């Protein structure tokens, strides 16, 4: 998967018209050059209708899928039939998939949970215990709810797995790159040294600035203490 921070330059290499294609995206974050979510970018720049864009969300770490451990996916698309077809194609004995029509909200959620996972990692690296982290994650889901409601108002249950579930697994899992990155920062690593040692991309690093700018550029800002702290 190409990280969102590098999507713009990679997509510019395309030589074929993708207007009539069905796009299934597992990329999490904002494309910096346009300030758009990945689905919005495909819609606005490549004129692909939202009915032909699907977003994959968790809670689902690839490492556990590779081990064939019971995992859960959310496929979000404006077209429920396409969403169900993708869900059926990805389902197996150990992968369960459900569908959602909240493509924008889910995209924001998968972006934000990476930021909150960095915060959880920083707290762990600083030696804060489970008591503190439980409060941190409780506050994170409330902050996520405020942010998503501000950016895309519609009826949604933020406690569903695509939002709360994905936040929890990313915030607590040993497989979470963003938590690992935050943990290293909390232990005193610089951003550059942490990135070099991990040799993997922590999407939350890029998402933090994007989320902050989205809120700052909004006519009615919302209170985002965790994002601002990260």
PLM regions with names:
Residues 1-4, 8, 17, 32, ...:
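Electropositive phosphate-/nucleotide-binding environments in soluble metabolic enzymes
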Residues 1-68, 86:
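Rossmann-like NAD(P)(H) cofactor-binding subdomain of soluble oxidoreductases
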Residues 41-53, 70-157:
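Internal alpha-helical scaffold of NAD(P)-dependent oxidoreductase catalytic cores
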Residues 22-27, 100, 224-227:
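Short beta-strands and strand-loop turn motifs
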Residues 28-30, 57-61, 79, 101-106, ...:
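Glycine-rich beta-alpha junction loops
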Residues 12-15, 43, 145, 149, ...:
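Generic structural signal for well-ordered alpha-helical scaffold segments
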Residues 16-17, 92, 187:
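A short linear boundary/processing microfeature
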Residues 113, 120-124, 128, 149-230:
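NAD(P)-dependent Rossmann-like dehydrogenase/reductase catalytic/cofactor-binding core
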């Amino acid at each position: 998967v190409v990280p969102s921070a590098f999507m713009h330059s990679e997509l510019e290499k395309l030589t074929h018209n993708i207007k009539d294609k069905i796009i299934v995206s597992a990329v999490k974050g904002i494309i910096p050059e346009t300030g758009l979510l990945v689905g919005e970018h495909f819609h606005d720049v490549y004129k692909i209708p939202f009915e032909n864009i699907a977003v994959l969300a968790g809670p689902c770490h690839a490492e556990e899928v590779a081990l064939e451990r019971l995992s859960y996916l959310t496929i979000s698309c404006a077209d429920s039939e396409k969403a169900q077809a993708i869900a059926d194609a990805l389902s197996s004995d150990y992968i369960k998939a459900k569908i959602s029509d909240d493509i924008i909200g889910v995209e924001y959620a998968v972006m934000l949970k990476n930021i909150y996972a960095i915060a959880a990692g920083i707290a762990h690296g600083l030696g804060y215990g489970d008591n503190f982290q439980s409060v941190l994650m409780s506050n994170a889901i409330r902050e996520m709810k405020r942010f998503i409601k501000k950016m895309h108002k519609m009826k949604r249950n933020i406690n569903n797995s695509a939002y709360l579930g994905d936040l929890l697994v990313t915030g607590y899992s040993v497989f979470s790159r963003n938590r690992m990155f935050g943990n290293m920062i909390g232990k005193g690593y610089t951003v550059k040294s942490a990135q070099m040692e991990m040799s993997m991309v922590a999407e939350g690093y890029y998402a933090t600035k994007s989320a902050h700018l989205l809120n700052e550029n909004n006519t009615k800002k919302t209170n985002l203490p965790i994002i601002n702290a990260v």
